[in-house]
Curated annotation (Swiss-Prot):
Pfam families: DnaJ, HSCB_C. It comes from Stutzerimonas stutzeri (strain A1501). GO terms for cellular component: iron-sulfur cluster transfer complex. Residues 5-77 form the J domain. It comes from the Bacteria. Belongs to the HscB family. This is Co-chaperone protein HscB homolog. The gene is hscB. Co-chaperone involved in the maturation of iron-sulfur cluster-containing proteins. Seems to help targeting proteins to be folded toward HscA.
Length: 173
């Protein structure tokens, strides 16, 4: 038995634009139905299947609630795999990456928690801009190469945002 499509699991049509509140509600509903504790008195095979269904549901939810993971998944459904560690080939974006990394390093050296918060806010705006761009481009099947380029950028910003969170935690301690 193969893994069902993440969107089908939630009775959604594959699309980038999702109602995240509706997704979360449906996830909670499905999680209650497939939770392994409900199968504690069942046979070993049923328990194993419940664990598998629960794991599949969790993976699907994590994928769909993240814009970059959702975009990457949509492309994969169409046969356009974007590796997780895909590099961005766009010179302008590479320069932007260098600028962000230098700024993050300065914030770290200065232990500037307020500066980190402002930096994080700018990253969030950049992420939202990429999400909006992907949503527009996704509607045009002829622009899948552009969509792949945006996913690479989205993945970079996700990684950088994680680094910012780690810096915040270190500075907060």
């Amino acid at each position: 038995m193969g893994t069902p499509c993440h969107f089908a699991l939630f009775d959604l049509k594959p699309d980038f634009e999702l109602d995240l509140a509706q997704l979360a509600d449906r996830y909670r509903e499905l999680a209650r139905q497939v939770h392994p504790d409900r199968f504690a008195d069942a046979g070993e095979s049923e328990q194993r299947q419940a664990l598998e269904r629960s794991a599949n549901l969790n993976e699907a939810y994590q994928t769909l609630k993240s814009p970059s993971r959702r975009a990457r998944y949509l492309l994969a459904l169409e046969g356009h795999d974007v590796p997780l560690e895909a590099t961005v080939q766009d010179p302008a974006f590479l320069m932007q990456q260098m600028h962000w990394r230098e700024e993050l390093e300065e914030l770290h050296e200065q232990a500037d928690l307020d500066g980190v918060a402002a930096f994080k806010s700018r990253l969030k705006q950049a992420q939202q801009g990429l999400n909006d761009d992907f949503g527009q481009i996704w509607r045009d099947p002829a622009r899948r190469v552009d969509a792949e380029r945006l996913v690479r950028r989205m993945q970079f910003l996700d990684k950088l945002t994680q680094e910012v969170r780690q810096l915040e935690e270190r500075l907060d301690d």
